[in-house]
Each structure stands twice: as structure tokens, then as C-alpha cells.
Amino acid sequence: MLAVPNMRFGIFLLWWGWVLATESRMHWPGREVHEMSKKGRPQRQRREVHEDAHKQVSPILRRSPDITKSPLTKSEQLLRIDDHDFSMRPGFGGPAIPVGVDVQVESLDSISEVDMDFTMTLYLRHYWKDERLSFPSTNNLSMTFDGRLVKKIWVPDMFFVHSKRSFIHDTTTDNVMLRVQPDGKVLYSLRVTVTAMCNMDFSRFPLDTQTCSLEIESYAYTEDDLMLYWKKGNDSLKTDERISLSQFLIQEFHTTTKLAFYSSTGWYNRLYINFTLRRHIFFFLLQTYFPATLMVMLSWVSFWIDRRAVPARVPLGITTVLTMSTIITGVNASMPRVSYIKAVDIYLWVSFVFVFLSVLEYAAVNYLTTVQERKEQKLREKLPCTSGLPPPRTAMLDGNYSDGEVNDLDNYMPENGEKPDRMMVQLTLASERSSPQRKSQRSSYVSMRIDTHAIDKYSRIIFPAAYILFNLIYWSIFS
């Protein structure tokens, strides 16, 4: 019975001791700090104590706070993008919004005659004012953004008329820039490469001059909603002085503005970037005109080759004709198949005609020579003194002798060492004088020989003179 009260008394003493210990810790905090120092401060508390000590010890090394870590207002909130409907143009329901444009041409990459297009890389900049994007600023500084903000606000919907391919450069990121002034003025710039159509006239090719245009227009907004204009007039177009092309000389760049009408939608403002190109002729002189001229001159060589040298004259004529055909085919392969005659076609085909006529000239000479040889054979058969002689021994009857030379044979006297064949020819010609019929046969025979020689002789003068005259007329018209 006495054990139960003693147990209760012991429990009471333990509880009272725990209360006293708790009260002592609450009234003596320095002791707790002292005890924690023995076990070690927590990591965060030690860092804070170290920083405070560093600031107190070296105030010179004290750094300003990093503003990027402080909470800032988002650009979307500053521009109040969520408070407006940017699917509508600025000033909707009012007058047309003016949008200025300027362009800097970076490069003119290529001109294709076959596809009738050109490729250009340029910086396209738009200027307009959108009061919905105005923001308060104490220093009147603009804000610059990349392409991510462009998708959240209104921008002009420009496109290139008659473009075949175009893209915005994206290396290393999208080449798009947006700059907003505190009063709401916006600059929108992007770097674009576009391939556009260019209607070319090749009637004077390769002595031609081409004018191409890059046309810029709003796709959806008519002139009642958007007024498109060159911001600085002709100064709105800037070009790099280093721009050059292999086959063309860039003569000038200039700008124009016109209105375009579509029956379904109405009138639109359209901006033009016009540039004039003049073709370099030196390349075509080396590749086309000089080879064609040389082939024509080479065909004239046959006029100085003996008419009996068939293996020499025929291959020469065929070679020049085939070479001219190859030149014509090569030029037309690099050109579009137009339905009109080009200047180079006139020159090449006239040259081809000259080469072909030289072949026909030899065909005529060879034919007349063959006919003449047949008549010679008949004449030898009719002459009694030469009928038994072989053809080489009748060379005295060659047409190189005139009538006077033939008559002089009457006075011919054989000298020592003279062959008797020549004497027989002399006697034959002398006997012909006593017969009027044989005299007429001899005259027609000699005249025939002179005519065949005259074709080659006159061709040596007529062909070069006619070709030189053609060149004078051609270059005076097209140059």
C-alpha cells in the first residue's frame, strides 16, 4: 500500500525537474548559442554571419545588387499587350495607317535567262506608329525585341509580288528585329532572300539591256486601310557598292510607287525596286562571235585550193558547216525558247549561210569542171593529131591560154630538145585555122576553161567583201 504513493511522488519529481529545465533555457538564450557553437552552426546561418563580417571588414569590396535578380516588370506588361486586340490594325475605323518602307540591298545573287528570274538578298524595314504600344519612360529610350514579340502584335502583311521563292534568314536565330519608341513608333526589320520573276526581252541578245523590278505590296489591306510609301523617297533604297555580276553591269537602282487594282478586292499601294542591267559583251565575243567569224574565214580557204583537189576542199567545207551548227546549238541551249529572232541568231545564221555558200561554190566549180573534161575528151577524139595521145599530153589545151596565145602557136618553132608531142599540138592548132567549124569549137572550149577559173577568182573577192559589209551593218544597228 505504501509503494503506490511513493511511485506517484517520484513521477511528480521527474515532471517538476523537466519544467525547471525548460524555464532555464527560455531565460538564458546565450547558453543555447554557446551549446550550438559546440555542435556547429547550420550552413545557412554560417554563410550569413560570414557575409556580414565581410561587409564590416572590407566595405570597399562591397558590390551593388544584381538588377537582373530583382523582380522586373515584363515587357508584355509594360507594353500592355494583353490589354489590346492586336488582330486589328492601328486606328481601325479611321484613316489609313501610313507605313514607311526603306530597303538596303545586300546582294544581287544571280540572273537566270532560262528561268527569267533573279535572286536578291535585302534588309526590309517598316516604320509605323501604334499608340497601343506606347509606354512610360523617364529617359526616352526605345525597347528592342527579337522575333518572338512580333507574333503577339500587329505588323504590316507585306509580300513580294511575282515572287517564286522567298525566306527569312534564321542563322543563328531569326533575322528579325522589333524596336518600339515610348510614343508608340515601331521599326520592324528583317533580312530576306527572294527570287522573283523578271520579264526579259532577248531580241537584242547578247547586246541587250534588261530592266527588272522587285514589287512590294500589302496582301490584305487596301489603300483605304494602309498607305504604303517610301520613307525617304529615292534615298530609301541603299545598295552595297561591291555588288557585281559576272555577265551584267548594274547601271542604276531607283524606286517608284504605283497603285495595283484587283477586281475582287480593290486598289493597293505597290512599291517598286527597279534596277537596270547591261550585259557584258566580251564573254560572247570570245565564245560566239569570234569562233563564228573564224569558221567563215576558214571556209574561204577552199577558194585558193585547186579545184581538182576534192579530198581537200570537201572535208574543209563539211567541217566548217558542222562547226557552225555546233556553235548555234550551244548558244540556243543556254537560252529560253522564245518565238522571235535574237540578234545573235541573225549573226550566226548569216555566218552559216556564208559557210554553206562556200560549199555550194565548190560544188558548182566541180560540176563545171566535170562537164568541161567531158567536152575535152570529145574534142580530143575529133582532133586527128591528138586522138591517139593520152590526156597528160594534151595539157597544151588548158584554158590558161588566151586566144592570142593560141594564135601565136602558128609561129612556134621547135627548139633543140623539144618533145615531138608539143609539135603535134602545134600542127593541130594550125590546121584548125583552115576550118571555121573547128575554130568555133576551139573558141567555146577555151571560154569554158576561163569561166570555171573565174568562179573561184571572183569568190575570193565577193565573199569577204559581202561578209565585211554585213558586219558593218550588224554592229551599227545592235551596238
UniProtKB/Swiss-Prot annotation:
The keyword GTP-binding does not apply. Residues 1-21 form the signal peptide. Inhibited by TPMPA, a rho-specific antagonist, when forming a homopentamer. In contrast with other GABAARs, rho-1 GABAAR is not inhibited by bicuculline, when forming a homopentamer. Disulfide bonds join 198-212. It catalyses: chloride(in) = chloride(out). Highly expressed in the retina. Expressed in a lesser extent in brain, lung and thymus. Residues 32-55 are annotated as: Disordered. It is a multi-pass membrane protein. It comes from the Eukaryota. InterPro entries: GABAA/Glycine_rcpt, GABAAa_rho1_rcpt, GABAAa_rho_rcpt, Neur_chan_lig-bd, Neur_chan_lig-bd_sf, Neur_channel, Neuro-gated_channel_TM_sf, Neuro_actylchol_rec. SUPFAM superfamilies: Neurotransmitter-gated ion-channel transmembrane pore, Nicotinic receptor ligand binding domain-like. Residues 302-313, 367-457 are cytoplasmic. GO terms for cellular component: chloride channel complex; GABA-A receptor complex; GABA-ergic synapse; glutamatergic synapse; intracellular vesicle; plasma membrane; postsynaptic membrane; presynaptic membrane. GABAARs subunits share a common topological structure: a peptide sequence made up of a long extracellular N-terminal, four transmembrane domains, intracellular or cytoplasmic domain located between the third and the fourth transmembrane domains. Belongs to the ligand-gated ion channel (TC 1.A.9) family. Gamma-aminobutyric acid receptor (TC 1.A.9.5) subfamily. GABRR1 sub-subfamily. Rho subunit of the pentameric ligand-gated chloride channels responsible for mediating the effects of gamma-aminobutyric acid (GABA), the major inhibitory neurotransmitter in the brain. Rho-containing GABA-gated chloride channels are a subclass of GABA(A) receptors (GABAARs) entirely composed of rho subunits, where GABA molecules bind at the rho intersubunit interfaces. When activated by GABA, rho-GABAARs selectively allow the flow of chloride anions across the cell membrane down their electrochemical gradient. This is Gamma-aminobutyric acid receptor subunit rho-1.
